[in-house]
């Protein structure tokens, strides 16, 4: 029975079809001026850039010049690269320009499509960022497409790991900048830790086109970019707690693989309390008493390390280090670390050296970073399954771009076996059968462990003519993937390793020329050898086509349909034939978690024998329903996390805007004066209650407060005894005394020095308090969920308490700045250079990208406070204290073992 919706779509087309058709008039207009554009000389074509910019300066919009601009880029691409964008690629370019996501199948030329809107939007002079998932793709695309932009008189920069600030500043100043998502986010955070505006490298967020947008804005949305600094060594504590976990039995804990959570049962809690008590680690009577919050955190991490994290699936151990494995690509991510002590728990489990924990100094999620852009667009081969998320969170529509040629790939029904062994046996038979007929095969696995298991079984069959592509050997990744289309080639790859590199039937011409003729100089010999490679690839392509094209064999379903579609999409590029099939077993993770027991019972009743498979569209639909459930749950998690992160993001915007204003100001005396006035108001209000009699005033407390904060010893107790004195009189006298003392100091310092001191103290104090605030919000976030048990909305509770914490931060800022400025003195000798804190930039458990760990060292200029001006009872007056100095509190201990220890908590 045909639905009314189906009839309507047949009559009028889908909404996607209508959106695509809406771009056709512009496509026709671009085609109509193609011959005229072709007739231009190179100089005339390049001069169009100047002409377009002049039109914009006169008031024209980018939409007004889209047609001639796209025509110019198309012609420049033809002349420079030998590639002429097809009509459907023009449509893709218009989709990107219109703030949307263009879903384009593998091999349809997304990289070339991007040049059209990139050039158009770069004409504004505000900069365009093209975002890729790794340094290799950023460099490759910048080098290739940069030739087109250069031909048209535009500059291209590329941001990769390891560049200096000067190099980054120059790259961001270009018309077009290629960069990874991680580098962009880290540069934003680092810019907002600088103390001079001219040290900042970014120049704003105008327009970004995100390649592999689903990977960056969906897969990585839950994992923030973090800049952190190391805390004190706690390796002994991790090792002690780790030793407890093997003593537990399954009834002592509960594991939820769906939610990736692990909790102790009542019996397990009692056993753990006894162990902790014997080790002298338990305070009070119970594990969950408030004073044991830190210990609870440690034991939970240890339990997860042993029961949820699997070696060679979630991480590998290499060179005495625990290295995270990307869940989606199977790549190693050296330098990346789990947060909140989880990585240290894994190191304790594996008996490798435990690295120090880190304290978060600055962080941001990709969700909030990319929403800062005035204009955002994206490209990918697989976005429709996440269309709702893109619309709700990023306000981005997903529009599917028609392929230039029809897709000929055959997607077969899944084959389901009862066990791993049966499944792998069938896969190996299928691989060898395809190899015999010369068909190239790409085998997709979900983990390193599975890829190596499959490779080992092939070797046992006496066959070793294959390539294994996983996290252990990713250096040759792009080349191996590019040659996976050679007839008879067998490539085993973890999930989507090598994403961004096309698999071309017969092999990749450009890569072969680069590898085989890289050292051969230009000339007749090189041209002859290039021609020989061209002919060889043509012949190999015909053989691969005759064998049926690329055959994608998947060893497991991923919990996301999108990842499965990405693997399928490797085959059948640009109208080539191809084939895909998924081989499953009831022992697979997805099947096991979602009802494999019932299916096993059903298959037994059907009389399924060992080695036999069931193939039926019903199985595919059942699995798709399970995947939709997982996708919906993950979307809800990301939506919920974003609601909480938005609270921090709103506060982050305020702080970063304040920092920028401070950096741009040469004189903040008025701001500092307002802070002093508000501090005095708070002091008086605190010690002189409203409508209270003079004898009820806390004169002693006010005197102490004035001494501790304002560094003024005033006869306040005498003032309050005066006949007829009021609250306003006390406030006025405090203000006059404070301003007089500050004015005298400012005159001694001189305007230039005083302005520098004020600015430095405000910025350093703001940074210190903001870092403490981030930690406080993290702690609040970790426990706020329990408010739900009291029938209160955790999110509303979080918003309310986060606001109170932020208000407290601002009050503390005013008080600390005032206290330091009232005590600061110039020292005669040049102060010793302070030791800079080591800061690491890392992205926790991300889902794509590699080798983008970016450590950095920063040193803030310090204002030295003379020891005689430090109040032992008020840390706000101590200024910068060296870790090995005697603590100003008078304890006699070193600062790092006394009050300095609190900074590390």
UniProtKB/Swiss-Prot annotation:
It is an enzyme of class 7 (translocase). InterPro entries: Helicase_ATP-bd, P-loop_NTPase, SEC_C_motif, SecA, SecA_CS, SecA_DEAD, SecA_motor_DEAD, SecA_preprotein_X-link_dom. It is a peripheral membrane protein. GO terms for biological process: intracellular protein transmembrane transport; protein import; protein targeting; protein transport by the Sec complex. May bind 1 zinc ion per subunit. Its EC number is 7.4.2.8. Zn(2+) binds at residues 887, 889, 898-899. One of its GO terms (cellular component) is cell envelope Sec protein transport complex. It is found in: Cell inner membrane; Cytoplasm. Its cofactor is Zn(2+). Part of the Sec protein translocase complex. Interacts with the SecYEG preprotein conducting channel. Has a central role in coupling the hydrolysis of ATP to the transfer of proteins into and across the cell membrane, serving both as a receptor for the preprotein-SecB complex and as an ATP-driven molecular motor driving the stepwise translocation of polypeptide chains across the membrane. Belongs to the SecA family. This is Protein translocase subunit SecA. It comes from Rhizobium leguminosarum bv. trifolii (strain WSM2304).
């Amino acid at each position: 029975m045909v639905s009314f919706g189906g009839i309507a779509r047949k009559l009028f087309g889908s909404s996607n079809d209508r959106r695509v058709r809406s771009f056709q008039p512009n496509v026709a207009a671009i085609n109509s001026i193609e011959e005229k554009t072709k007739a231009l000389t190179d100089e005339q074509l390049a001069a169009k850039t100047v002409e377009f910019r002049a039109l914009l300066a006169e008031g024209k919009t980018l939409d007004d010049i889209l047609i001639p601009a796209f025509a110019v880029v198309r012609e420049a691409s033809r002349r420079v690269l030998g590639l002429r964008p097809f009509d459907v690629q023009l449509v893709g370019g218009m989709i990107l320009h219109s703030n949307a996501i263009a879903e384009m199948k593998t091999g349809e030329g997304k990289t070339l499509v991007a040049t059209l809107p990139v050039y158009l939007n770069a004409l504004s002079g505000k900069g365009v960022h093209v975002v890729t998932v790794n340094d290799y793709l950023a460099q490759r695309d910048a080098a290739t497409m940069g030739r087109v932009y250069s031909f048209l008189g535009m500059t291209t920069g590329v941001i990769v790991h390891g560049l200096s600030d000067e190099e980054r500043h120059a790259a961001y100043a270009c018309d077009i900048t290629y960069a990874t998502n991680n580098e962009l986010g880290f540069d934003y955070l680092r810019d907002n830790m600088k103390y001079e505006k001219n040290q900042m490298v970014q120049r704003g967020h105008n327009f970004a086109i995100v390649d592999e947008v689903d990977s960056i804005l969906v897969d990585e949305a839950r994992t923030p970019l973090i800049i952190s600094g190391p805390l004190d060594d706690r390796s002994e504590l991790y090792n002690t707690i780790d030793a407890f976990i093997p003593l537990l039995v399954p009834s002592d804990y509960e594991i939820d693989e769906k939610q990736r959570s692990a909790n102790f049962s009542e019996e397990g809690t009692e056993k753990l309390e006894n162990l902790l008590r014997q080790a002298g680690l338990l305070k009070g009577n119970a594990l969950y008493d408030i004073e044991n919050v830190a210990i609870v955190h440690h034991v939970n991490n240890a339990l997860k390390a042993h029961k949820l994290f699997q070696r060679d699936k979630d991480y590998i151990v290499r060179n005495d280090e625990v290295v995270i494995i990307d869940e989606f690509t199977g790549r190693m991510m050296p330098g990346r670390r789990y947060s909140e002590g989880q990585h240290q728990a894994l190191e304790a489990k594996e008996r490798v050296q435990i690295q120090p924990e880190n304290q978060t100094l600055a962080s941001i999620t990709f969700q909030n970073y990319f929403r800062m852009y005035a204009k955002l667009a994206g490209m990918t081969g697989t976005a429709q399954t996440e269309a709702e998320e893109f619309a709700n969170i990023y306000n981005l529509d997903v529009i599917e771009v028609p392929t230039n040629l029809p897709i000929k790939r055959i997607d077969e029904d899944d084959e389901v076996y009862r066990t791993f062994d049966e499944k792998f046996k069938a896969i190996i038979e299928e691989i060898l059968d395809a190899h015999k007929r010369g068909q190239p095969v790409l085998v997709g696995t979900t983990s390193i462990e599975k890829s190596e298991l499959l490779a080992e079984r092939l070797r046992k069959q006496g066959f070793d003519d294959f390539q294994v592509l996983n996290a252990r050997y990713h250096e040759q990744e792009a080349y191996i993937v590019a040659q996976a289309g050679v007839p008879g080639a067998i490539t085993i790859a973890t999930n989507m390793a090598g994403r961004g590199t096309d698999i071309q039937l017969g092999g990749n011409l450009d890569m072969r020329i680069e590898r085989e003729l890289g050292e051969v100089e230009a000339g007749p010999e090189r041209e002859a050898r290039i021609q020989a490679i061209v002919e060889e690839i043509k012949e190999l392509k015909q053989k691969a086509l005759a064998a049926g094209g690329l055959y994608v064999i998947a060893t497991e379903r991923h919990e996301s349909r999108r990842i499965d579609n990405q693997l399928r999409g490797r085959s059948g590029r640009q109208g080539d034939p191809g084939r895909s099939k998924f081989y499953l077993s009831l022992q697979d993770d997805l099947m096991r978690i979602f009802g494999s027991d019932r299916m096993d019972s059903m298959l037994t009743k059907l009389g399924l024998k060992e080695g036999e498979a069931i193939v039926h569209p019903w199985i595919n639909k059942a699995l798709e329903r399970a995947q939709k459930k997982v996708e919906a749950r993950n979307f809800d998690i990301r939506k919920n996390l974003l609601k909480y992160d938005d609270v921090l993001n709103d506060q982050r915007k305020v702080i970063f805007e304040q920092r920028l204003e401070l950096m741009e100001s040469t004189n903040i005396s008025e701001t500092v004066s307002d802070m002093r006035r508000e501090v005095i108001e708070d002091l008086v209000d605190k010690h002189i209650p409203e409508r209270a009699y003079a004898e009820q005033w806390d004169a002693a407390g006010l005197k102490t407060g004035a001494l501790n904060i304002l560094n003024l010893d005033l006869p306040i107790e005498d003032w309050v005894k005066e006949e007829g004195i009021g609250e306003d009189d006390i406030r006025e006298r405090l203000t006059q005394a404070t301003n007089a003392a500050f004015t005298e100091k400012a005159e001694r310092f001189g305007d230039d020095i005083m302005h520098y001191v004020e600015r430095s103290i405000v910025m350093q104090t703001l940074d210190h308090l903001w870092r403490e605030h981030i930690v406080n919000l993290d702690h609040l976030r970790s426990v706020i969920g329990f408010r739900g048990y009291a029938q209160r909305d955790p999110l509303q509770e979080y918003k309310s308490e986060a606001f109170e914490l932020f208000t407290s931060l601002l009050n503390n800022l005013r008080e600390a700045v005032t206290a330091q400025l009232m005590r600061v003195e110039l020292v005669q000798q040049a102060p010793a250079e302070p030791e800079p804190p080591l800061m690491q930039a890392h992205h926790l458990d991300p889902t794509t990208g590699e080798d983008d760990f970016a450590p950095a060292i920063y040193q803030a200029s310090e204002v030295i406070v003379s020891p005689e001006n430090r109040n032992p009872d008020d840390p706000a007056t101590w200024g910068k204290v060296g870790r090995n100095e005697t603590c100003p509190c008078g304890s006699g201990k070193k600062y790092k073992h006394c009050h300095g220890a609190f900074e590390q908590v």
